[in-house]
Amino acid sequence: MRAGKLREDFSALVEAIRLTQMDNPLVVEVGCGSAWNKEVLGKFSNTTVRYVGLDYGVEMLKTARTTYPGIATLVGDAAELPFRNGSIDILVSGTLLMHLMSYQKAIEESRRVSRRWCIFHTVPLLQIRETTVLRKDAYGQPTLEIIFNNAELHAIFTANRLRVCAAIDSLPYDLQPVLGEPTVTKTFVCEVMD
């Protein structure tokens, strides 16, 4: 990225923000980690964004504040967001849903706090199999990874009054050797419906 070439997932996020057509939006990234997407949006987005990062990992947020002095960060849980209803222009779920057993609640909370848009970034998808939970070691600890059935995920979006306006290709991520069917990742741009 610092050489000027974006990875597919970074390009997907920049495109998702562009598709909202908002000027100077308040963007809250849930699951921001070390907040590298702040840099991505700052360098490559066609609009200025007011960025706030939220993560439950205190150490990750310390890294974010060291790397990006002055960044606004909060410790919080995706299933219990510390924001008022409709207070955020664009809620970005940053490669997070795949690690949450409470993903349905996280989607509901994303919808609750978002005024206009929810972006669910780099979501792994299946077409045939039901939503599947895998367990692996990552980030130095046992971690779960959820691969979503595309139709099931769309039904959850619809139930939460989120209209999918775009599904952008993200990182290549084919788990066919493990799951017996090809997988992809998408970044979903969802409009909040009244």
Task: Show where each model-derived region lies.
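Short catalytic micro-motifs in class I SAM-dependent methyltransferases
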Residues: 95-99
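Short alpha-helix
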Residues: 144-167
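Conserved class I S-adenosyl-L-methionine
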Residues: 1-21, 24-33, 40, 119-147
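A conserved beta-strand element that flanks and buttresses the S-adenosyl-L-methionine
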Residues: 92
